Amino acid sequence: MRQFFPVDDLARDERFVQTNMAERMADPRRAQPERSPKSSKSRGATARLTPDRREASDAARGLMHGIMTGEIQALEGAGRTAHDFASGDGTNDTIPFALKLDMARQAWDEARHVEISVKLSDWMGTELGEFPENTVLFSAACSDDPILRLAGVNRALEGLAIDVFTQMKEFGDLAGDPFLEFCEDWMLADEVTHVKMGSDWLRRVTENDPERRAKALEFQQVVDKLFSFGGLRGDTDESPIALARRFRELAGFSDDEVEIISEMDREALAERKEQIRRAREAAGLEPEPA
């Protein structure tokens, strides 16, 4: 069987429309609710994805579609990691056999998540391909170094999944949708184990190779920063997706690691605000109200 499958060769039928990060963030239907016109001191000023938003339906459906395509790629990525590398002690492009088994178990979890997500999307009135598929998750699973895959996929992107599932679980609760709430809670429990597994293996395999560990954690920060674009996720009410600190701690993140992610989210939000300010200034528009 072929090894090291490139992202350009992913098997997709005509229903799927693939996109890049820039195009995705420009999609007006993405889960980035507008701020309420109420006072910034009121609860209505939050940018969190809640059912009372006028664009809540499209935002939630778009986010659910993104979860579904992400689960497909997570399944493909876990399967590739189990197959691409020979069994060994973790050096010279090998991975411990026990890690192969863990990745195979994760692939089974992801297959179940795909089935759940497809049914949830149908439940929410979304057709496959209605929203574009961003293939960055599988791109992170294409590294020649299995430890970079653990850092980029299991810690960074599966970590983001913890934040997203927590937000969607809360959305289902507020919307009075027990199906959405239960399914998101079920998948969230799996994601915590996936991130914890990735964290544990990264530390074990790089225990005697601090340079390799530092490189992996640097790659993780690059991926985290990419998905912090525009402050989509963060601790403040200006971010639609909250940083799920408690679940990240359960998944093996240290307090310092969570703070680093939070700081990157704040920087990304500030960068987006500055981009908006410059764009409005160039267009001759008044600055946005504070």
Which residues make up each language-model segment?
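Non-heme di-metal
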Residues: 1-290
